[in-house]
Amino acid sequence: MKKTALITGFTGQVGSQMADFLLENTDYEVIGMMRWQESMENTYHLNDRINKKDRISIFYADLNDYSSIQKLFETKRPDVIFHLAAQSYPKTSFDIPIETLQTNIIGTANILENIRLLKAKDDYDPVVHVCSSSEVYGRAKVGIKLNEETPFHGASPYSISKIGTDYLGRFYGEAYGIKTFITRMGTHSGPRRSDVFFESTVAKQIALIEAGLQDPIIKVGNLSSVRTFQDVRDAIRAYYLLSLESAKGKVPCGEAFNIAGEEAFKLPEVIDILLGFSTRKDIKVEQDKERLRAIDADYQMFDNTKIKSYINWKPEIPARKMFEDLLNHWRDEIKKGNIPLNR
């Protein structure tokens, strides 16, 4: 019998790429969880398959609505859950801290509690990927590579919410034997990356300038950060491989893993790389105070040793290729008439 995979956050960048990966590389039946009001711009290419029920379907539910999550698990019983849904924008979390905490912590608890109850009732035993974030490490010391034992130091309401999510994944694994594993992904990007994130807003603005829709000035926030970057498609491959090992019982319940790129950049270097792909050579950069966070994680470098000891994985897509694909994504969106907001 074919396995069923549930993807929460199906319409987001990571969720939509996860659906693509599973449909192309497995025989899984895929269930995409989404809210009624969500945009499907990242999943338009799957609509025909969804309409034909060709190995993919949609289930409407909301992380904050326990009854809809309960109905989802009672009726579908997925074999593997990739829990990717979240309020995932650190800067936005300063504006809506309560909603961020509610969605990310209580929403995750709603999923795990439903699984716990079904496991106690009739031995329901799925694999559960709980997506945390490298933001849990917050303001790390310069020169230190972050590993899974590095203390948490939340630097935004978002990062604090992900600390809670991380602990929930570990607790439900250790206390109830649910096959949870937690991932702390470093900065990831590529096609479909939301423009609220640094490299994507830079790429979007370049595409707008090339199309004559914006003056040749890129507006940015903090430029002092040093980050590793990886292509989201590399991260998704790691998620899938970890889920296979978890299903075999080779990943301890509640285990956490860093997943990060191995190419580090200062943010001005990211701008220079993207500008190098542009057809315009007159673009200037201007700092915008409205884009600054109250506090930021300025330095993040990672140690991937642990995950490599569990699965045969390493980042394969070069960061420069990822940045070029991101810029081309925005060029394509603008050509289609999908003019984004200035943010």
Predicted regions mapped to residue ranges:
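N-terminal Rossmann-like NAD(P)+-binding domain of SDR-like oxidoreductases, especially those catalyzing
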Residues: 1-188, 329
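Amphipathic terminal alpha-helices
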Residues: 3-4, 13, 25, 319-343
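Core catalytic loop region at the nicotinamide-binding pocket of NAD(P)H-dependent oxidoreductases
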Residues: 213-218, 242-259, 334-341
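Non-catalytic, hydrophobic alpha-helical segments
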Residues: 235, 239, 259, 270, ...
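Mid/C-terminal beta-alpha module of Rossmann-like enzyme folds, strongest
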Residues: 202, 245-292, 304
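NAD(P)-dependent short-chain dehydrogenase/reductase
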Residues: 142-144, 167-243, 262-267, 271-277
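Residue-level signal for the nucleotide or nucleotide-sugar donor/cofactor binding architecture
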Residues: 64, 95, 103-106, 149, ...
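Conserved C-terminal active-site "lid" loop/helix of NAD(P)H-dependent oxidoreductases
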Residues: 45, 232, 256, 290-314
